[in-house]
Every structure is written in structure tokens, then in C-alpha cells.
Amino acid sequence: QARDLLGLLLLRWDAYNLKTVLRGKRAHAPTEEVLASTLPVGWLDEVALAELTQVTTLRATADTLETWRSPLARPFREGLRAVGESGDLQFLEFALDRFAFAQALRAVAEDGDNDCVVRDYLRLLVDKANFLTALRYLYERSALSPVEAGRHFLEANGRFTRAHYDAVAGARDVRHAMALLADTPIRRLAGTFP
């Protein structure tokens, strides 16, 4: 079980590395620079990531992941459908994150000591991802409607709730968002904004 759990935790890094490669390719960054920004500790090793930097399209990337039987192939394909004509990678990135976190949280549904520690850690990571996503929507008001932004909330029963997420995404500005969070579990962060 420990090996399976470790593999699921490393799946998050595979998702991170895949998103890094996609962003690097989108920015036309040199391959060496893209690879230097990855942490190949999971299923996608250095060789696989280097190969993905050479794949020319998102569809070809999906095909490559499927050929390799990567666990990220299915969520990548689903995210790719959401990208559609817009070419906006956020839908694809969200599908990868949702899958990686959901798989790991499902694996730690037990009540053992190790599972509790890992579950709390995963919830912290999901809270962080939700907080940063809400801030992005606050910053990029025109990017998505509140309903669309709400679809990107990752469920993990963490301390940063859907109500917190909606409050931040709908705030007037960052200071207002932090003021709304003053009586929440992330009040220390909220207190850094005067």
C-alpha cells in the first residue's frame, strides 16, 4: 500500500511537470529551460519529459500519453476537449489537477495514521490550489464568469471552503478579498495585506 500511495502522491508532480512542458512550449521556451523547470520524480521521467517537449500539438501529446498508458492520458484528453478553439490551457491544467488530487484523496480514504497525515497534506495542497485559482479569477475578471470560475473549485473538504473561494473570486480587489478572509483559517495570509 505504501508504494501505491507514493505513486499517487507523485502523480501530482507528473501533472505539474506536464503542465510545465505545455506552458514552456506555448511560450516557445528553449527545451533546456523547460526541463530545468521540472521535477521528474514520478512516472514521467527525464526522458519522457524531454520527448514531450518535442511533440508538436496538444492532440499529439494526448496520443503520446495514451501510447505510454500514462494515468494522465484520460484527464488530458478530457481537458483537451474543454480547450476547444480558445486554446486556453487553464481547462487542460485544471483537468490534470482535479484528476491527480482526486486519485490521491480516494486512495487515502482509510483511517490509518499514515492516511490521515497524507490526507491532511493533500487537503492543504488543494486549499492552496483553490486559493491561487480564486486569486487568478479575481485578477482576470473577464477570463471567466463566476459560474465558470466555480467549476474550477477542487473538492477536498479542506479549510478553504467553496464559500471562501467564491468570496475571493468575487471581491472588489485583493485587499477586499483578504479582508473577507480575516476570520478564516488562512487569516495569517489575509493579515499581510493592510
Where in the sequence are the language-model features?
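Extended alpha-helical surfaces
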Residues: Q1-P194
